[in-house]
Amino acid sequence: MARKKITLVGAGNIGGTLAHLALIKQLGDVVLFDIAQGMPNGKALDLLQTCPIEGVDFKVRGTNDYKDLENSDVVIVTAGVPRKPGMSRDDLLGINIKVMQTVGEGIKHNCPNAFVICITNPLDIMVNMLQKFSGVPDNKIVGMAGVLDSARFRTFLADELNVSVQQVQAYVMGGHGDTMVPLTKMSNVAGVSLEQLVKEGKLKQERLDAIVSRTRSGGGEIVALLKTGSAYYAPAAAGIQMAESFLKDKKMILPCAAKVKAGMYGLDEDLFVGVPTEISANGVRPIEVEISDKEREQLQVSINAIKDLNKAAAEILAK
């Protein structure tokens, strides 16, 4: 049986962490691509030398040539300018559209059948741009956002309630930004809803509201602390979870920025937006779940924000 090939476009902090996790989980051979001369090759050599220690036997190589994307089963895109202190994800729009054009054309010409995961910000717009330039079908391209945002939500809830994070199931929908929608109605601790915990006095409403707010600004909090970069351990872990579900046909239902068809969640057009999504060997399948009226209103705000950025992206492309 042929080994799978995972290509990571962007060999920075997230790309390097993705590569290490892919090796540890024995998902397949790894290619690290970056435009920086020598950097992906150096990281690949370093990672290759972990294999005897980790007890794994896979190939890792670095490259500056898009031809090396050929026959990739999975491509995870992190290439682009990262956030800096005081910078919103949306500030990155113009710069990273150009990056997505170059990367998209590289995918189109070398691995059009690959399963593509986009991590570059602003996420919901970049995955749209990446599809535009790559031509990858709706079911084979997805954005990583909700898995990360939900993990942050779960972490903050577990810390507040002093319980195992494994006991906390919490979900975030909508765009990957300030308008994201943490679903307090669906989320629970060992089967007990957050609403019930509030009623019982085990979780104060003001603390829940603060956790929701902190989740929305979770990425910015890390950027402010690091000062010279943005999060990479958790984003990489989220991307690998999605890739593993595809490669192993696990059919996990994860919150992701999938191409949601008009009619679902009140959409009047097809749109990449974060919703519960099944990821299998066939690709992605958005799922519609019941949400409260308040959450639906919040989701609409998030949808409108994504549409506005898509319009801004279209204007940039038209220049």
Curated annotation (Swiss-Prot):
It is an enzyme of class 1 (oxidoreductase). Its EC number is 1.1.1.37. Signal peptide: none annotated. One of its GO terms (biological process) is lactate metabolic process. Substrate binds at residues 83, 89, 121, 152. One of its GO terms (molecular function) is L-lactate dehydrogenase activity. Keywords: NAD, Oxidoreductase, Tricarboxylic acid cycle. The active site is at residue 176. Pfam families: Ldh_1_C, Ldh_1_N. NAD(+) binds at residues 10-15, 34, 96, 119-121. Belongs to the LDH/MDH superfamily. MDH type 3 family. Catalyzes the reversible oxidation of malate to oxaloacetate. This is Malate dehydrogenase. It comes from Francisella tularensis subsp. tularensis (strain WY96-3418). The gene is mdh.
